[in-house]
Amino acid sequence: MDVKIDILTLFPEMFHVFNYSIIGRAIEKNILSINTFNIRNFTENKHRKVDDYPYGGGSGMIMTAQPIVDCINSVKTQNKGNVVYLGPRGKIFDQSMAKKLSSEKELIFLCGHYEGIDERVYRYIDLEISIGDFIVTGGEMACIPIVDSICRMIPGVLSSTESYTEESFYNGVLEYPQYTRPEFFRGDRVPEVLISGHHENIRKWRRAKSFILTKNKRPDLFERIELSKEDRELIKLYENGYTD
């Protein structure tokens, strides 16, 4: 097994999605393993209760420390990876973080629920990640796309390295426009350069369109790009209506 990912959750059935498609095939090939552990199984009370009212009052319930910490400690006996908590205090997840985490051989993800976790659990957490400044039902909803993004970059998961190096965000830009057959669809034609067979012109077109899309749709990303002289010339050329 190349990579081991363990997920601590109250809802393990939500992660059955990883049994399908690209990630499912990678698991079948033993390129990686994704295991879930039900935090509720580590409770010490007869009702298997994992939450309680917050000290000081307030709305909602808080996940108690004991079952979470005992679950972490149990998993740690077979997985020495960092504990990653999906929570609002964390750094916003992006492609650069996905690249970094995909190089880890072992990872443990902790999914919170309700109004959050007891503060004392944080001393057992190595990294906190957020998917954005909005509210979701639980950490599971954040964990699924994060794990999927990481797994796609593990060698052998995709058919070729090129499959992910040309995708949006991998190099900090949006992916160029894509087309497939038919060549003509209700008056709309595939750009001629893509059916020309001229590989260098196709490369330039794709690169220019990638930058222009990023500039127009995600100016925040575009501002961070270090453009070469060729890049600036290509952008100017295609923005002025040039076609190959």
Curated annotation (Swiss-Prot):
Catalytic reactions of this protein: guanosine(37) in tRNA + S-adenosyl-L-methionine = N(1)-methylguanosine(37) in tRNA + S-adenosyl-L-homocysteine + H(+)
Any one GO molecular-function label of the UniProt entry: tRNA (guanine(37)-N1)-methyltransferase activity
Keyword field: Cytoplasm, Methyltransferase, S-adenosyl-L-methionine, Transferase, tRNA processing
A GO term from the CC aspect: cytosol
Major localisation: cytoplasm
Record: residues binding S-adenosyl-L-methionine: G112, I131, G132, D133, F134, I135, V136
Localization (cell): Cytoplasm
Known EC number: 2.1.1.228
Enzyme's top EC category: transferase
An example Gene Ontology biological process: tRNA N1-guanine methylation
Stored SUPFAM superfamilies: alpha/beta knot
Oligomer and partners: Homodimer.
NCBIfam families: PRK00026.1, trmD
Described purpose of this protein according to its UniProt entry: Specifically methylates guanosine-37 in various tRNAs.
Family to which this protein belongs: Belongs to the RNA methyltransferase TrmD family.
Name of this chain's protein: tRNA (guanine-N(1)-)-methyltransferase
Lineage: Bacteria, Bacillati, Bacillota, Clostridia, Eubacteriales
Gene this chain is encoded by: trmD
